Structure formats: structure tokens, C-alpha cells
A protein has these predicted regions:
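Intrinsically disordered, low-complexity linkers and terminal tails enriched in Ser/Thr/Pro/Gly
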Residues: 4-184
């Protein structure tokens, strides 16, 4: 999927929200998507759609009355609850995010693709976010920032998993153990 130069962008997501650090309005550790308005004008998102399925761009329709402030942020909980927005704007999509490489988050309006991201796996409590906000550069954020500027240190990827030269087990005598990693591209 390719994106057009959108006013509103998918700016951050967490598909591994756990541990109680960021709870939704029902007290659950729901995953979430943050949208960012790159303009100096409020944007009415009522009728826009969010999806995790390229074959169904209209999987979740954002309720009428939901706007995103100029240069502002909007978090949509991906809880699977599909609840309409409450009085303070907590919005729950009717699907959940998964921790599978290759899954998508897609933002569209009237069937026209506005933005999309092919998700990457993250560790528990981490998120992926654009840094700086709205840019083309995605980073691992070890301190997620829903509804706020993506601040703090961002990492392009996780360190590769080390490999030992000997399999696990019990050995007699002295053994020389070496660790190695394959650098990521």
C-alpha cells in the first residue's frame, strides 16, 4: 500500500501494550493507534476509517463529532470493543492489533487511502512511532507517548539476538564459549 501526502498521519502504535502502564478508559491494557494532524487547522475525522486489513479499508469507521486539533494527536484504542466515543472522546475500534510482522494499520477517508504502515513486532510496553512527528522515519520507542509528541530516544531496531558457538548442555572440562551477532541492515 502506498500513501498520499496526508494531512493526518498514523504517528504511533502499540501492539504490545501490557503491564498496566497505559490503561484505556475501561481499565484494560488495550493496544492503540495514535493519529497526528500535520496542519494548523482542525480536521473532522468523522466518517474516516481505520483498518488492519487491506481488503477491508472501512473495517472501523470513526464516529461523527471526532476532530483532531491543529498539530494535535488522537489515540484510538484497538480493543475490539467497537464502542462509540464517550463524553471525553475515548474511541474503541472493533478490531485488535496483532504482534505479527507484516500486518497493517490503514487510515482512509471515503475509500481513499490517506496513510498506512506495515507493522513491526515490538517488545512488551514498547511502541513504534514517527520521529519527529509526522515524518517518514519510524523508531522503536521504549517509552510510548500516546497523545503527545514522540520524545525521548528512538531506536531504528532492536539489537540482534546473540548466538553462542556451543549448544546448551553440560560439558566436562574447560570450554571456550563465543558469542556473535549478525548485524542488521
Amino acid at each position: 500500500l502506498s500513501s498520499v501526502n496526508a494531512q493526518v498521519k498514523i504517528n504511533e502504535y502499540s501492539a504490545s501494550n501490557s503491564g498496566g502502564a497505559i490503561l484505556d478508559n475501561t481499565g484494560d491494557n488495550s493496544d492503540w493507534v495514535e493519529l497526528y494532524n500535520t496542519t494548523a487547522t482542525a480536521v473532522n475525522l468523522g466518517g474516516w476509517s481505520l483498518s488492519d486489513n487491506p481488503a477491508n479499508l472501512n473495517k472501523y469507521t470513526i464516529p461523527s463529532g471526532i476532530t483532531i486539533s491543529p498539530n494535535g494527536f488522537l489515540r484510538i484504542w484497538c480493543s475490539g470493543k467497537g464502542n462509540p466515543a464517550d463524553a471525553v472522546g475515548h474511541t474503541h475500534a472493533n478490531f485488535k492489533l496483532t504482534q505479527c510482522n507484516g500486518d497493517w494499520i490503514i487510515l482512509s477517508n471515503g475509500g481513499a487511502l490517506k496513510d498506512s504502515i506495515q507493522m513491526r513486532r515490538t517488545q512488551a510496553t514498547h511502541s513504534m512511532g514517527r520521529k519527529p512527528d509526522g515524518s517518514a522515519t519510524w523508531n522503536v520507542l521504549t517509552a510510548p507517548t500516546p497523545n503527545a509528541t514522540n520524545s525521548g530516544t528512538g531506536y531504528t531496531s532492536y539489537a540482534p539476538r546473540p548466538v553462542m558457538n556451543l549448544p546448551a548442555g553440560f560439558y566436562s572440562g574447560t570450554k571456550l564459549v563465543a558469542l556473535s551477532v549478525t548485524p542488521s541492515n
